[in-house]
Amino acid sequence: MMTDVLTHGHKTMAIKINILPTAEDLAGKSHWWGFPDLPEAFEWPCDEDGDLLTFICQISLEDISELDSENRLPHKGMIWFFAELDYFLGDLDAPCGGTGEWEPGTFKVLYSEDHSDLLTHEYYWEDGEPAVLPAEEMTFEAASETDFGFKLLGMPAMTEGYENENEGLMSLLQMDEEERWGLRFFDCGTINFMIPAERTNDDFSNVSFCLHSS
């Protein structure tokens, strides 16, 4: 198991995420939206009212290992991201976390080193339609640490006014707006799952979440 300690204060690369519609079956693979494929011991995370958090993506870490030369993430296993995003996808009756740092329970990151035996967790509306956006394919390439867009690692693209929230942290996942999904974060915003800059690379126990908006 890798236990490299990550350090802060120097320029690091990030990993750009490209997200593309596909007809391919992505069960058990890296994908954005769709249904999460979880180990038997894991449940789909819920908010404090018992409602399912929006499943954002799952990433097979083998897919990004060649781009992570500093070993800031494990190079085996799967990581899953969830957050309370229905409001920003057009459901104006859903809870809205606002700008700045969100409360615990409104987001969740899961990690498992073993992802050989996963169960697809499906969720449908009463009319039988999937209660999720269609799963989309993900590809990865190198990026600069402060780039906008969808990326792993690096630093948040939007920092002005949020310096206190970001101190001592680095971005784990950054998510930008996307017209194709009707996804907006107020006025030109981004969200970031944040982790301590100094940590072992398989430690996801202290994740925070921040919405940055101009």
Q: What does each of the following model-derived ranges do?
A:
Residues 1-214:
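Preference for intrinsically disordered or flexible, low-complexity segments
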